């Protein structure tokens, strides 16, 4: 590819008989997943330092052949000349089968989900920084979630920092 463009492809396979959860948390053992990421970074704009556009996606199925997950994610991160940034994220997750959260009581179908998020971050090269964001997300079992969050970080030197974060969510599907 060319400068400012990267492409990644990954394939994962976990057998049903091999249990490697002792190495750390894994979502599931019987899994076949294909994932890809395409990132384009551009610079040289008069009003911004850089813009990074990111497209990612994955599809996965379990050993029984059920489609257990997938999604496409679009992210655009714009870094301004003063090093503050705006990030926009949107995603889509199609209907899938969930055979883990029923705790052995069968397989059920989850709904398709969409999400939209917008975040702002002040420049991180100063002692006092702040950021915040807002998002709207559809829940896996129905209903919507609105989430608002942010925070302030004080970093007077490289050896000390203090952080205050807040988060508020309103869930309609729970």
What is each of the regions a protein language model found here?
Residues 1-174:
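Exposed, low-structure sequence patches enriched in small/polar residues
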């Amino acid at each position: 590819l060319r400068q400012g463009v990267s492409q990644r492809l990954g394939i994962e396979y976990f057998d049903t008989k091999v249990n490697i959860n002792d190495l750390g948390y894994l979502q599931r053992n019987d899994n076949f997943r294909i994932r890809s990421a395409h990132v384009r970074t551009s610079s040289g704009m008069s009003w911004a330092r850089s813009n990074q556009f990111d497209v990612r996606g994955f599809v996965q199925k379990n050993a029984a052949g059920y489609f257990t997950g997938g999604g496409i994610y679009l992210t655009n991160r714009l870094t301004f000349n003063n090093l503050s940034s705006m990030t926009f994220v949107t995603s889509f997750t199609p209907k899938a089968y969930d055979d883990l959260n029923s705790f052995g009581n069968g397989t059920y179908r989850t709904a398709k989900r969409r999400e939209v998020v917008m975040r702002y971050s002040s420049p991180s090269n100063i002692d006092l920084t702040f950021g915040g964001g807002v998002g709207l997300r559809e829940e896996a079992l129905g209903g919507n979630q609105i989430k608002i969050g942010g925070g302030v970080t004080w970093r007077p030197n490289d050896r000390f920092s203090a952080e205050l974060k807040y988060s508020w969510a309103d869930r309609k599907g729970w």
